Amino acid sequence: MVARLGPPSPAGAVYRVPDSREGWVEALCKLTDLAEDGGGEITFDVSDVRPRGSIIHGFGGVASGPGPLIEMLANVADVLNGCVGRPYTPLDLMEVDHAIAAAVIAGGVRRSARMSTLPWRDEANIFRFISCKSDPAHHWSTNISVAVDADFFEALDAGDSHARAVLEEVATGMAVNGEPGLVNMSLAQVGETSTDLVPNPCAEIFLEAFEPCCLGHLNLA
């Protein structure tokens, strides 16, 4: 496949995608690097990727073939092209993440789980975020929760209009499809030494970057 980012440009590099998880990741990195470098054209040769239905001996399950990879690269390119000339928004990045997750899920085995959160103070994006799953065709690969804190509840008690509007929209969404949830970042910090914490996909536990999601101690408790 050929991916073009930005205005028309001469033919660019060719990347022959290896038949491995690392190869798929590298293909995505080459696409996003191209966007960061100002755009251009790149061709992805997927002839080495094993066909759909092949057994995956190491991980288990069956291969999804090159189709989901091509679709993911095309969808990410569409998102990046839509951002030319402006900063990325949280919803743009969620679209990229969703495209990646959809490619990972393909193959008949549950291989991807996501949680997306956005701070309640982000007035520019929070209401679009809250309603982003109202269309079942979008963002079905992620759970979504609004990140609140002690200030949020104090603002509610003080009658703050933005905090009240956020809570009302959250409640409306919950009544329709159960989302978004609320994650209390102030409570998540109790007893923790790091301020850079994010919830796991089901929000049972808060983790630092690259920390393994082990729920054994929660289950034992």
Task: State the predicted function of each range.
Residues 67, 71-83, 91, 95, ...:
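Conserved, charged catalytic cores of large soluble enzymes
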Residues 1-72, 173-221:
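Function-dense linear segments that define catalytic or interfacial modules
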